[in-house]
Amino acid sequence: MIYGIGTDLVEIARMEAWCRRWGEKAGRRLLTAAEQAEFAAHAEPARFLAKRFAAKEAFAKALGTGVVAPALLTAIGVGHDELGKPVLILSDELAAFAAARGIARMHLSISDERGHALAFVVLES
Protein backbone atom coordinates (compact mmCIF):
# COMPACT_ATOMS: atom_id res chain seq x y z
CA MET A 1 0.00 0.00 0.00
CA ILE A 2 1.23 3.52 -0.74
CA TYR A 3 2.34 5.37 2.39
CA GLY A 4 3.21 8.63 0.68
CA ILE A 5 4.12 10.34 -2.59
CA GLY A 6 6.41 13.33 -2.95
CA THR A 7 7.79 15.36 -5.82
CA ASP A 8 10.08 18.35 -6.09
CA LEU A 9 11.29 20.60 -8.89
CA VAL A 10 14.53 22.57 -8.50
CA GLU A 11 15.87 25.33 -10.71
CA ILE A 12 19.51 24.55 -11.42
CA ALA A 13 20.37 28.28 -11.43
CA ARG A 14 19.33 28.33 -7.75
CA MET A 15 21.97 25.70 -7.00
CA GLU A 16 24.55 27.60 -9.07
CA ALA A 17 23.93 30.61 -6.82
CA TRP A 18 24.19 28.34 -3.77
CA CYS A 19 27.57 27.05 -4.99
CA ARG A 20 28.83 30.58 -5.60
CA ARG A 21 27.68 31.70 -2.15
CA TRP A 22 29.07 28.79 -0.15
CA GLY A 23 32.01 27.69 -2.30
CA GLU A 24 33.62 24.49 -1.02
CA LYS A 25 31.13 24.35 1.86
CA ALA A 26 28.10 24.11 -0.48
CA GLY A 27 27.89 20.34 -0.34
CA ARG A 28 28.35 20.03 3.41
CA ARG A 29 25.04 21.74 4.13
CA LEU A 30 22.99 19.48 1.86
CA LEU A 31 24.79 16.18 1.30
CA THR A 32 25.80 13.03 3.13
CA ALA A 33 29.53 12.28 3.44
CA ALA A 34 29.36 9.81 0.53
CA GLU A 35 27.53 12.35 -1.64
CA GLN A 36 30.08 15.06 -0.79
CA ALA A 37 32.87 12.98 -2.31
CA GLU A 38 30.85 12.47 -5.49
CA PHE A 39 29.92 16.17 -5.56
CA ALA A 40 33.57 17.27 -5.29
CA ALA A 41 34.47 15.22 -8.38
CA HIS A 42 31.36 16.03 -10.45
CA ALA A 43 31.75 17.91 -13.75
CA GLU A 44 28.50 19.83 -13.15
CA PRO A 45 28.26 20.45 -9.39
CA ALA A 46 25.14 22.65 -9.52
CA ARG A 47 23.25 20.04 -11.56
CA PHE A 48 24.39 17.32 -9.15
CA LEU A 49 23.21 19.39 -6.16
CA ALA A 50 19.88 20.21 -7.81
CA LYS A 51 19.09 16.55 -8.43
CA ARG A 52 20.08 15.53 -4.91
CA PHE A 53 18.16 18.41 -3.33
CA ALA A 54 15.03 17.54 -5.35
CA ALA A 55 15.27 13.89 -4.28
CA LYS A 56 15.66 14.77 -0.60
CA GLU A 57 12.75 17.23 -0.65
CA ALA A 58 10.56 14.70 -2.49
CA PHE A 59 11.38 12.07 0.15
CA ALA A 60 10.55 14.45 3.02
CA LYS A 61 7.22 15.26 1.37
CA ALA A 62 6.40 11.57 0.84
CA LEU A 63 7.28 10.89 4.48
CA GLY A 64 4.90 13.68 5.47
CA THR A 65 7.28 15.47 7.81
CA GLY A 66 8.99 17.96 5.57
CA VAL A 67 12.67 18.61 6.22
CA VAL A 68 12.78 18.39 10.03
CA ALA A 69 14.62 15.98 12.33
CA PRO A 70 15.14 13.17 11.77
CA ALA A 71 14.44 13.82 8.05
CA LEU A 72 17.28 16.31 7.62
CA LEU A 73 18.90 16.80 4.22
CA THR A 74 22.17 15.29 5.46
CA ALA A 75 20.29 12.19 6.70
CA ILE A 76 18.77 11.47 3.28
CA GLY A 77 21.26 10.11 0.76
CA VAL A 78 20.98 9.19 -2.89
CA GLY A 79 23.00 6.37 -4.40
CA HIS A 80 22.62 3.94 -7.27
CA ASP A 81 22.01 0.21 -7.48
CA GLU A 82 24.10 -2.13 -9.65
CA LEU A 83 22.11 -1.12 -12.76
CA GLY A 84 22.42 2.61 -12.11
CA LYS A 85 18.89 3.11 -10.77
CA PRO A 86 18.76 5.85 -8.12
CA VAL A 87 18.06 4.64 -4.59
CA LEU A 88 17.48 6.40 -1.28
CA ILE A 89 19.99 5.73 1.49
CA LEU A 90 18.82 6.83 4.93
CA SER A 91 20.80 7.46 8.11
CA ASP A 92 20.26 4.84 10.81
CA GLU A 93 18.04 7.21 12.81
CA LEU A 94 15.89 8.12 9.82
CA ALA A 95 15.67 4.49 8.66
CA ALA A 96 14.38 3.51 12.13
CA PHE A 97 11.89 6.41 12.02
CA ALA A 98 10.61 5.25 8.62
CA ALA A 99 10.44 1.60 9.69
CA ALA A 100 8.45 2.56 12.81
CA ARG A 101 5.87 4.05 10.45
CA GLY A 102 5.69 0.83 8.46
CA ILE A 103 7.63 1.98 5.43
CA ALA A 104 8.97 -1.12 3.71
CA ARG A 105 9.93 0.06 0.21
CA MET A 106 11.13 3.32 -1.30
CA HIS A 107 11.09 4.25 -4.98
CA LEU A 108 12.95 7.22 -6.46
CA SER A 109 13.01 8.69 -9.95
CA ILE A 110 15.19 11.67 -10.87
CA SER A 111 15.25 13.65 -14.10
CA ASP A 112 16.92 16.82 -15.31
CA GLU A 113 16.63 18.92 -18.43
CA ARG A 114 18.37 22.19 -19.19
CA GLY A 115 17.46 24.45 -16.28
CA HIS A 116 15.57 22.11 -13.94
CA ALA A 117 15.91 18.93 -11.92
CA LEU A 118 12.90 16.86 -10.83
CA ALA A 119 12.51 14.01 -8.36
CA PHE A 120 9.56 11.76 -7.55
CA VAL A 121 9.38 9.46 -4.51
CA VAL A 122 6.87 6.76 -3.62
CA LEU A 123 6.99 5.17 -0.16
CA GLU A 124 5.22 1.85 0.39
CA SER A 125 4.13 0.20 3.61
Swiss-Prot record:
Keyword Membrane recorded: no
Swiss-Prot/TrEMBL catalytic activity: apo-[ACP] + CoA = holo-[ACP] + adenosine 3',5'-bisphosphate + H(+)
Record's keyword annotation contains Lipid metabolism: yes
Any GO BP: fatty acid biosynthetic process
First-listed, main subcellular location of the protein, grouped into a coarse class: cytoplasm
EC top class, as a word: transferase
Coiled coil (residue ranges): none
GO cellular-component term (any): cytoplasm
SUPFAM superfamilies: 4'-phosphopantetheinyl transferase
Family listed: Belongs to the P-Pant transferase superfamily. AcpS family.
Name recorded for this polypeptide: Holo-[acyl-carrier-protein] synthase
Encoding gene per record: acpS
